[in-house]
């Protein structure tokens, strides 16, 4: 959160899991808002996965973001639907969750998908050996992670929120991440609008419909851009046949501007 394309992204993730395309290991928030984890738990529970591991950013550089609408979906969902975790700060530390899960997975098997800030991943890379693994964060990621897929950046150059909201973490991650990163830039999801069919579904007590209906009624009747949904799709299904990709090197400066240099 707080953009409601996050809700759409979770719906895509769960739908693809229902179809057998992905095993969801955890849902981890880079947003320290106290409402984030209750909302994530509600969506996981609706899709019959109430026991998915949850984690939240605890680092000093992590952002706290709230929904910009007058009537906030992040307040409406926890009021309407039951949840076990009262507030985000009650959830486990994101880095601990990452490390505890990664150490149990086969080598080169995990895809990490980010649709927010890079704060948690910086903390993961900088982590030391612990009760879960003697390896450093970089060593653990290098051994266990297949790829990182991120909704971040504008290509070939620009300034995009998920990068500049914590520019120092973004710069660190893109410079030190030890596996391939696939970037789904702002320009991808900007050309995809979703929400109208979701908001008209003939169902009641459906948190995805509730969120889209509420937010679309506050100034976006056509629906919402789908930055995060597109990224989750690529993370799980790959970028073909809908997109093409090129290899290159990304750079992020202290103000959160990104540039791209194509390589062969």
PLM segments and residue spans:
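N-terminal acidic, glycine/proline-rich low-complexity segments
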Residues: 1-264
């Amino acid at each position: 959160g707080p953009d409601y394309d996050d809700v759409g992204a979770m719906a895509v993730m769960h739908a693809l899991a229902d179809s057998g395309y992905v095993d969801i290991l955890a849902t981890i928030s880079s947003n320290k808002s106290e409402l984030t984890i209750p909302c994530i738990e509600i969506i996981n529970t609706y899709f019959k996965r109430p026991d998915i591991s949850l984690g939240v950013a605890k680092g000093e550089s992590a952002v706290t973001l709230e929904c910009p609408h007058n009537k906030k979906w992040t307040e409406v969902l926890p009021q309407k639907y039951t949840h076990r975790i009262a507030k985000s700060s009650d959830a486990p530390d994101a880095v601990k969750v990452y490390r505890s899960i990664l150490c149990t997975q086969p080598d080169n098997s995990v895809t990490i998908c980010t649709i927010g800030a890079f704060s948690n991943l910086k903390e993961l890379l900088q982590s030391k050996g612990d009760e879960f693994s003697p390896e450093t964060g970089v060593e653990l990621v290098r051994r266990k992670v297949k790829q990182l897929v991120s909704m971040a950046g504008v290509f070939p150059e620009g300034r995009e929120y998920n990068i500049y909201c914590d520019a120092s973490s973004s710069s660190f991650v893109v410079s030190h991440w030890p596996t391939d990163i696939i970037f789904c830039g702002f320009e991808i999801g900007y050309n995809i609008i979703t929400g109208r069919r979701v908001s008209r579904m003939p169902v009641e007590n459906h948190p995805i419909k509730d969120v889209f209906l509420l937010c679309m009624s506050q100034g976006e009747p056509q629906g919402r851009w789908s930055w995060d949904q597109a990224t989750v799709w690529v993370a799980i299904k790959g970028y073909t046949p809908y997109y093409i990709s090129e290899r290159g090197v990304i750079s992020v400066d202290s103000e959160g501007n990104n540039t791209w240099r194509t390589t062969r």
